């Protein structure tokens, strides 16, 4: 990759990481920290944005590849939180908190998949 491509990914990553941090903190203030609602919200919205962007740009319009670097790889890559989701799930598992473990795993997998599918359906219906 050329240096310019790394810059597009980095720029998207900066914005995505900051958005993730802000939304995670904001959600924790509203919902508390007994369940990782911020991680779930971020994963769902990130999945939706990625699905919307990729379906739109592969099925509807051509975009310059730099936009995929910026949005799909940079922004969504830094914004979504699979590693946080995996860690939080492991903690619940190790604590024997089976309800929160199952709820976290199922909610992230089902709702994120639904967000991507919904975004694709939305783009195709427009």
Swiss-Prot record:
Location(s) in or outside the cell? Cell inner membrane
What reaction(s) does this enzyme catalyze? Answer: fluoride(in) = fluoride(out)
- Keyword tags: Cell inner membrane, Cell membrane, Ion channel, Ion transport, Membrane, Metal-binding, Sodium, Transmembrane, Transmembrane helix, Transport
What's any GO biological process attached to this entry? cellular detoxification of fluoride
Membrane topology value:
Multi-pass membrane protein
Spell out the Pfam families in the cross-references.
CRCB
The molecular function GO annotations come to:
fluoride channel activity; metal ion binding
Q: Which GO terms describe its cellular component?
A: plasma membrane
Residue ranges spanning the membrane: these are: 7-24, 35-55, 69-89, 98-118
- Provide the binding site for Na(+): 77, 80
According to the record, the protein's activity is controlled as follows: Na(+) is not transported, but it plays an essential structural role and its presence is essential for fluoride channel function.
Origin, by domain of life? Bacteria
What exactly does this protein do?
Answer: Fluoride-specific ion channel. Important for reducing fluoride concentration in the cell, thus reducing its toxicity.
Similarity comment text for this entry: Belongs to the fluoride channel Fluc/FEX (TC 1.A.43) family.
Cross-referenced PANTHER family? FLUORIDE EXPORT PROTEIN 1-RELATED (PTHR28259:SF1)
What protein am I looking at? Answer: Fluoride-specific ion channel FluC
Gene this chain is encoded by: fluC
């Amino acid at each position: 990759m050329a240096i310019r491509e790394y810059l597009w990914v980095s720029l998207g990553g900066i914005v995505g990481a900051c958005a993730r941090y802000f939304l995670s903190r904001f959600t924790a203030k509203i919902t508390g920290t007994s369940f990782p609602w911020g991680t779930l919200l971020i994963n769902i919205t990130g999945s939706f944005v990625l699905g919307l962007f990729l379906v739109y740009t592969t099925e509807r319009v051509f975009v310059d590849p730099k936009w995929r670097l910026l949005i799909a790889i940079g922004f969504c890559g830094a914004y979504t939180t699979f590693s946080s989701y995996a860690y939080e799930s492991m903690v619940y598992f190790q604590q024997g908190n089976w309800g929160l473990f199952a709820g976290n795993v199922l909610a992230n997998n089902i709702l994120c998949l639904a967000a991507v599918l919904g975004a694709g359906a939305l783009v195709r219906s427009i």
